């Protein structure tokens, strides 16, 4: 560890928040239908979509109408992705000559990209055709990100309304987020990445003549365009199996900084957009501070663990001052640590190093950040929505202490809101721990493990944590392309995505009809240090405590095993 490493981590985390603030102001204008500088160009395009779909963009939907449209849209997206992947072998733009995917892999991949998880049970360069990468996977990177943003927009309207009825129009929110936010930003970032050396071609690849005299086929794709939305949309699915550790996806420290910042920038922007939309910037600033504290602590922990000399290297008398296993030398430990925290604190899941090669406590921290609910800052819209749920639970706990009906952002928090909040936060532990418990004893599931003992348990726990939290990163020792893993992880991804979405929209439906209350003497201030501390406590208890027994069986036991093995060497 040195000051340069800490400065690199601070710069990466800080840039994302700093850039996210002005983008949040712009995003709130998009959500609220206000005029933007892109209106002269995009308003006519927007109108074409509404006319083609028969959409009345001014018609506000009830929460269940909004949720129904969202679920129907995503189900159709799932069917289209599944069909293209199954029929890949007979479809055009397949210069690689790849055959169609199996039923279970198509099922898993379709759910993965529709839910913004981007878990990949395959290697992209040996499995996916150019058409599959561009037509369905990249398109879903846009649409799944926009879907998450619509949830936050609907929830914001519920807090603003005074005895209102509707929470907005799903189709209008989806179109506007895609056209005005995701497409322009992705275009700019893609151009920058092309200039910095990322491939952007429809060619299948090139043949290289190696020094040994053999020929090697090097795969090429339209990498830059997919990389841009992969990061900005907080998706994470890589064109290549090595993801952002691959030199075609992330060749230099500069591209690493740009793409790392891109992981979190729109997540933070959604926080600021929510604050501007509900006219409560100070209250949302408290949420940003709480999330930043937890994310910074996570990054610091990973950096500390990875800059300790690995005990096995000490025992073998290997001269090294840092654990470089699984890391790219062009990035080093600080950039890897920052990426680990940012990709698991958000629902991104891309990697610039191998998480399975992290020290046990470093890998455990990656899991722990996902266990907190993907709210640091989480996905576009989905992160702030779940953070608002945590804030609702925090004011509920505070209300119990003083014997008053809690209020948050001018709305009374009553039994229905608390029930829906609990349903939201229970989705991750129920699916993660339930499936992990079954997989730990089922022979069919255990066939996919490369390791036994606590690291094998960590592989299982990490996989289902990543799936349910819609993250998508993995411990690479798990062979997941098998019927059991593809099917159960697909179900876990759907549970982790749509249970919280429906619960949050139901909460929005409950809040929208309530009167907007002015703060009174008995209202708990939700913008000061006391509330930040209370919120962090609620997040740690609801997120961390539920998973501690499982973590104790995996990374914590492995940590002490490593120490014991070295002590007995």
From Swiss-Prot:
It is found in: Cell inner membrane. It comes from the Bacteria. GO terms for cellular component: plasma membrane. Keywords: Cell inner membrane, Cell membrane, Ion transport, Membrane, Potassium, Potassium transport, Transmembrane, Transmembrane helix, Transport. The system is composed of three essential subunits: KdpA, KdpB and KdpC. Belongs to the KdpA family. NCBIfam families: kdpA. This is Potassium-transporting ATPase potassium-binding subunit. It comes from Caulobacter sp. (strain K31). The gene is kdpA.
